[in-house]
């Protein structure tokens, strides 16, 4: 029998409780994952009581309130607050999403917040995105065209060709989809994952790019592409409503067509 043991410092323990100092009109408890690698201690779940009557409507508003008024050491990423930049991607109430567009009212009971799953944690709710970005760089996500550029205009495309990019270019690389994918959890060192494969197809589908063959050859690998088993977590969790699984399927179809299948 195989015995699997977690490292001793991986067990999440109960952390500090920050109780309300005064009566609240709309009290709500927020439970947040805390981890600081510099302390060489187990991660914990800290509990904070906040007044929703004095807090904005989104989960990110609650985190900002906690950081500003209760515990300034709480660490998380955020920027646009409009679901555009992808900085505040995290696991909220068991689902990967963006804290800035997740309404508190959609959550019943305690608000439970963790970093994106199966990624190294820099601190608290901040995941290490370096491997994810390296995978993105590996697909060469820029227009590649070996023909001379037009002298008096940009490289143009028809309205119909432009529409082929809808549902692809909107990806904000938040990694919600990839970190919800069990195949990426198991083979993330080699499998590119839903987000990167959707981005790869974005350039394959672009009529202005003439490196389609080379791009497909680069993806034709048992691990890079074919670890996708259509589990569909990626499509379900995408905060932009995109369909990475569909894009992956199209890449597989194009490769099959190249081999006459």
From Swiss-Prot:
GO biological process: respiratory electron transport chain; tricarboxylic acid cycle
Record Pfam families: Fer2_3 (PF13085), Fer4_17 (PF13534)
Residues that, per the record, bind a ubiquinone: 186
Catalytic reaction annotation: a quinone + succinate = fumarate + a quinol
Keyword annotations of the record: 2Fe-2S, 3Fe-4S, 4Fe-4S, Electron transport, Iron, Iron-sulfur, Metal-binding, Oxidoreductase, Transport, Tricarboxylic acid cycle
Cofactor note: Binds 1 [2Fe-2S] cluster. Binds 1 [3Fe-4S] cluster.
2Fe-2S ferredoxin-type domain ranges (all copies): 28-119
Pathway: Carbohydrate metabolism; tricarboxylic acid cycle; fumarate from succinate (bacterial route): step 1/1
Protein name in the entry: Succinate dehydrogenase iron-sulfur subunit
Residue span(s) of domain 4Fe-4S ferredoxin-type: 161-191
Quaternary organization: Part of an enzyme complex containing four subunits: a flavoprotein, an iron-sulfur, cytochrome b-556, and a hydrophobic anchor protein.
Similarity comment text for this entry: Belongs to the succinate dehydrogenase/fumarate reductase iron-sulfur protein family.
InterPro entries hit by this protein: 2Fe-2S_ferredoxin-like_sf, 2Fe-2S_ferredoxin-type, 2Fe2S_fd_BS, 4Fe4S_Fe-S-bd, 4Fe4S_Fe_S_CS, Beta-grasp_dom_sf, Helical_ferredxn, SDH/FRD_Iron-Sulfur
GO molecular function annotations of the record: 2 iron, 2 sulfur cluster binding; 3 iron, 4 sulfur cluster binding; 4 iron, 4 sulfur cluster binding; electron transfer activity; metal ion binding; succinate dehydrogenase (quinone) activity
EC number(s) stated in the UniProt entry for this protein: 1.3.5.1
Cofactor(s) required, per the database record: [2Fe-2S] cluster; [3Fe-4S] cluster; [4Fe-4S] cluster
Binding site for [4Fe-4S] cluster: 171, 174, 177, 238
Residues annotated as binding [2Fe-2S] cluster: 80, 85, 100
Residues reported in the UniProt entry to bind [3Fe-4S] cluster: 181, 228, 234
């Amino acid at each position: 029998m195989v015995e699997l043991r977690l490292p001793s410092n991986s067990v999440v323990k109960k952390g500090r409780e920050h109780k309300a100092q005064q009566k609240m009109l709309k009290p709500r408890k927020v439970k947040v994952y805390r981890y600081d690698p510099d302390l060489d201690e187990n991660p914990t779940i800290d509990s904070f009581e906040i007044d929703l009557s004095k807090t904005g409507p989104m989960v990110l508003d609650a985190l900002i309130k906690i950081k500003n008024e209760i515990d300034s050491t709480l660490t998380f990423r955020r920027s646009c607050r409009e679901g555009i930049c992808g900085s505040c991607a995290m696991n909220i109430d068991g689902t990967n999403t963006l804290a800035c567009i997740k309404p508190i009212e959609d959550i019943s009971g305690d608000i439970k917040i963790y970093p994106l799953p199966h990624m190294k944690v820099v601190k608290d709710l901040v995941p290490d995105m370096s491997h994810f970005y390296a995978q993105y760089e590996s697909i060469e996500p820029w227009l590649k065209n070996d023909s001379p550029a037009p002298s008096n205009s940009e490289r143009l495309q028809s309205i119909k060709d432009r529409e082929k990019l809808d549902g692809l270019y909107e990806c904000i690389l938040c990694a919600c989809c990839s970190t919800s994918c069990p195949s990426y959890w198991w083979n993330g060192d080699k499998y590119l994952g839903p987000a990167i494969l959707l981005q790869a197809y974005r350039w394959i589908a672009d009529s202005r790019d003439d490196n389609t063959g080379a791009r497909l050859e680069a993806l034709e690998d048992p691990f890079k592409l074919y670890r996708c088993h259509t589990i569909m977590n990626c499509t379900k969790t995408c905060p932009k409503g995109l369909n990475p699984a569909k894009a992956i399927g199209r890449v597989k179809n194009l490769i099959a067509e190249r081999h006459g299948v």
